[in-house]
Amino acid sequence: MSIGSHSFSPGGPNGIIRSQSFAGFSGLQERRSRCNSFIENTSALKKPQAKVKKMHNLGHKNSTTPKEPQPKRVEEVYRALKNGLDEYLEVHQTELDKLTAQLKDMRRNSRLGVLYDLDKQIKAVERYMRRLEFHISKVDELYEAYCIQRRLCDGASKMKQAFAMSPTSKAARESLTEINRSYKEYTENMCTIEAELENLLGEFCIKMKGLAGFARLCPGDQYEIFMRYGRQRWKLKGKIEVNGKQSWDGEEMVFLPLIVGLISIKVTEVKGLATHILVGSVTCETKDLFAARPQVVAVDINDLGTIKLNLEITWYPFDVEDLTPSTGNVSKASALQRRMSMYSQGTPETPTFKDHSFFRWLHPLQDRPRLAILDALQDTFFDKLRRSRSFSDLPSLRLSPKAGLELYSNLPDDVFENGTATTEKRPLSFTFGDLPYEDRVPPANSAEPSSAHVTSSPDIATTATQHRARAQTAAAVTPAEGKACPGVRCEPRGHGDSCQEYPPGFQKPSDTGSDRVFIEANVPVSLLQDTDEGSELKPVELDTYEGNITKQLVKRLTSAEVPGTPERLPCEGSISGESEGYKSYLDGSIEEALQGLLLALEPHKEQYKEFQDLDQEVMHLDDILKCKPAVSRSRSSSLSLTVESALESFDFLNTSDFDDEDGGGEEVCNGGGGADSVFSDTEVEKNSYRTEHPEARGHLQRSLTEDTGVGTSVAGSPLPLTTGSDSLDITIVKHLQYCTQLIQQIVFSRKTPFVTRDLLDKLSRQTLVMENIAEISTENLGSITSLTDAIPEFHKKLSLLAFWMKCTGPSGVYHTSADKMMKQLDINFAATVNEECPGLAETVFRILVSQILDRTEPVLYSTMSSEIITVFQYYNYFASHSVNDLGSYLLQLAKEASVVQMLQSVKDGKLQQNVSKINSNNLPPQQEVLRALALLLNENKNEVSETVASLLTATAENKHFREKALIYYCEALTQPNLQLQKAACLALRYLKATESIKMLVMLCQSDNEEIRKVASETLLSLGEDGRLAYEQLDNSPGNLSELEVAGELNLPQLSRRTCLSVTATEEGWSCH
């Protein structure tokens, strides 16, 4: 092991910081004063790769019982153990959330084998979490019993003292004898419980990392290290090699934790056969070793700290033989992703790990029965269905073991495809009718098995018709009450003929195919009809490309459609092909974005009033989306179970095998309004459905809530949170995610007040946006006829409103893409901008889009199509900059872009020619200018960097410029771009920004040596305050406050520990 290849220091001037918290102690008084505990770092949780070495006499847990109880020590160890177990649980919960989200993202572009592997990981993590929870309950139970015995023992002890001081008598002596017996019993019980608790402490895996010393270790030196922990021993010898490496005869050892006992470490230098020089001996605390993550410690062996022993200690709550699941196993997850492209378009014909089955929808062959899917399911579904007498019995027939409402998953939509490149999908048609409750039998003799297949179910008849080449599915919902009417479809009952009538407006389906399956169910029309105008329902198209038939039926019946009028906003439009990038925001549903925001907000909710205001508005919005008032109530709540059961009876067509019973909160929000293009063929059908049945959503949703107790909640409802408009749903998700990002930045920069204030102002504006969205969601979307109804202030900015309407498309007016806005800006303003500043139009438009999105760096062209801009972002940006005319504002941005261009010319060598044109008076404090200035400071040319440095120093005298620059550069320190971080450090140096000292101190903990060096130099350049901060960092890094930084920031998460170099790189965490 090469000690030189590791850095055990957070970055002091000498490269290694002295350990002050873990010096151990010996018989000397001054060394006792240095006794402290092991410390913890934040390296990634590791999985043991193999069975590690144990002492030969430690094959079993401790069975010896202590002679005397140690209640104070037990309490300390219990607290440490409980914290460690809770931390383990939290780490695994985080990993479970990440894997679940990854599974959901992969469902659309992956195959069955990949999903199966990932789901196995999820199941393993869940099992391990359940085991942890059970382990925690056992520990709590033992400690509770221990506390009871301790109180009894204390009581008996006090009674002993009382009787000892009282006059002696026969009764007193008898009582004292009884008390002594009880006291002994309670003491033995405490000792027994201590032994049992000790068996639940898990294992410490200690890995030898080598010795480190300041010019103390020489090639050829031999050392012997002896560790003693109770009755456990570990002795190993090592030698310092010529190349600086160290060779040791042992690398790792497992110690069983003890309640009473400290680890004693003795290091001796071997000079000869009988010559051993004691280097040092220390005794170390162990209670702080109960942590979920591996900890690297540097132990001061001698008084001066010139010899350090580096160990990596990992605690496992269970035996190492019981290998933990791969939490944080990034390599396996990435391997899964690499394998995604290796799978063909077909899916394996293998059953999954649940009661569901996956079926491969093959292209029909001439000699192949065309109803193979129904034949395969006949034994498991239709046989049971044949014996049922009503739809209320159907929940017991479901293939899924779940009770209650079905949880709809989102597997790839091509799960019914075959392996060929061009596949043809077979349509299914579901027709609901009021059929008499009588047994139906298939024809006695059928010429072709697939021509007619009629089950004997009293409620569902299936008839096969000819194949239709068009890959589309129709579900015709036909109401009838009591007897046959023009909407009834008569199925054959023993004969090959069939009669069929269609009301006006219905399109007769083709009878030339043989691959359509019609399923008829008795569903009373009163559930879907409450007024005279809802007397009939038009055919509703279902698309097999959507993959989930049942979900489409629920979604179609519950979509919040309204009558389509020319003056209405096109906010109910579905996501079309031109806006594929928007789908990711629907995949990341409102529930997920809401959960992410609340998780980020919860620990810090009491710190700022703005956090509390945002929390209140977000919860208000959540309540509105959960409890949106239905248009009208169902006439009979009992009828809702009929529809629910009828839809659940089609679960055999559902492709969701990866849903868990408790996975209801993982719904993907596709938006109720997005049903138009998915289910309807023509605008006539869309408008007729909207006109006649706007209350369908209200009926079904309210009925399900009444009868099942499950409404539109996140966890239990088949209906995901939605406003009824895809566009508004995307807008909500975008702003929830932006609020989460702001909270994370506020938490990171909370020690820099001027940055925090600016971020809190942005968060306050987002709170107002949430309030506005809640008002819009409360109202019926059909009553909003223009954006001025949603944002009344747009009346004062009609030119901006007109441009926004040009940027929006059929997917809705509440959002657009950055790509669309760029194209529209080019159409409307390119000529004007290029006339004023030739060649800068595209640059100016990109700057505008980046600023609307509140990005510190320009938006990449490759991500333009997927970047979402909401109408609230658009309006708030121009309102905050007091812009009424977009054209004039673009010309202003063009002048700023010309300044950036001049700065770039300085980089190209035209220094003397352009530096005179740039001075502190005409230098605008815009982020593009500030970014260009900072990046120029990174130039290797001294002439360029010196010129820019003098320019920044001069502009620092301008109070307005300096304030804007400080805010931008401090926010840049939180970005993952290392070059931008370095440039921001240099810029703060020349601005003499003493306000940024605390953020620079945090950067001094970075693993990147260049960043650490620049941050340290910047600290030292900030006068006395900076020097003192650097010295404090050098001498006592453990005094730094813990940073609570989210993973999106990609910055080191520092903890209040010492003797560590905890760093974050672009690839991930590293710990030394």
UniProtKB/Swiss-Prot annotation:
Annotated spans, Disordered: 439-465, 683-718
Biased composition (Polar residues): 447-460
Cross-referenced InterPro entries: ARM-like, ARM-type_fold, FAM65_N, RIPOR3
SUPFAM superfamilies recorded: ARM repeat
Entry keyword annotation includes Cytoplasm: yes
Tissue specificity of this protein: Expressed in myoblast and myotubes (at protein level). Expressed in brain, eyes and skeletal muscle.
Compartment(s) where it occurs, according to its Swiss-Prot or TrEMBL record: Cytoplasm; Cytoplasm, Cytoskeleton; Cell projection, Filopodium; Apical cell membrane
One GO term (biological process): positive regulation of filopodium assembly
Keywords: Cell adhesion, Cell membrane, Cell projection, Chemotaxis, Coiled coil, Cytoplasm, Cytoskeleton, Differentiation, Hearing, Membrane, Myogenesis, Signal transduction inhibitor
Chief location bin: cytoplasm
Function: Acts as an inhibitor of the small GTPase RHOA and plays several roles in the regulation of myoblast and hair cell differentiation, lymphocyte T proliferation and neutrophil polarization. Plays a role in fetal mononuclear myoblast differentiation by promoting filopodia and myotube formation. Maintains naive T lymphocytes in a quiescent state and prevents chemokine-induced T lymphocyte responses, such as cell adhesion, polarization and migration. Involved also in the regulation of neutrophil polarization, chemotaxis and adhesion.
Quaternary structure and interacting proteins, as annotated: Homooligomer; homooligomerization is regulated by RHOC and leads to the formation of concatemers through the association of N- and C-termini. Interacts with NCAM; this interaction is necessary for myoblast protrusion formation.
Family: Belongs to the RIPOR family.
Protein name per Swiss-Prot or TrEMBL: Rho family-interacting cell polarization regulator 2
Name of encoding gene: RIPOR2
